[in-house]
C-alpha cells in the first residue's frame, strides 16, 4: 500500500470515532433531525470518497479530485434533504469539512489555491450544504 493510501486510511480511521461521538451527543444518537439511515448515509459517502481518492494514481489532476469533493457534497446534500434540511449544519461543517480537505490534500490537491484554503466552499455555496 502506498504511503498516500496509508495516510488516507489513517485520516478515516481517526475521523470515524469523532463523527460517531458527534452524533451520540444528540437525541437517539442520530444527530439533530437525523435517522439511523442518515448516519449510515453520511458514513457510506465518506467511505466512498476515501475509496475514490485511494483509487486515484499519483499525479491525478486537481479537477478529478474536485469532482470527487463535489460528488461527496452532492450526496451529503441529499442526506440532509431527506432529514428536512436541518441535519448537516454548522457543527457538522466544522467536523466534516476539515476531514474532506485533509483527504483531498493527501490525494494531491493544493488547498492553498482556493479561497480560505477551502476547496469545498465553491460546492457548499452552490449546494447550500454545510
Regions found by a protein language model. Give the residues of each.
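Charged, amphipathic alpha-helical oligomerization/scaffolding segments
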Residues: 41-48, 68-71, 75-78, 95, ...
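Amphipathic alpha-helical binding modules
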Residues: 84-130
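Short secondary-structure junctions and interdomain/linker hinges
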Residues: 26, 56, 60, 79, ...
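Short terminal alpha-helical segments
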Residues: 1-55, 127-128
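Residue-level recognition of alpha-helical structural elements
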Residues: 38, 61-65, 85-92
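Generic alpha-helix signal with a bias toward terminal, lower-confidence helices
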Residues: 24, 57-58, 77, 88, ...
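Mature extracytoplasmic domains of secretory-pathway proteins
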Residues: 53-80
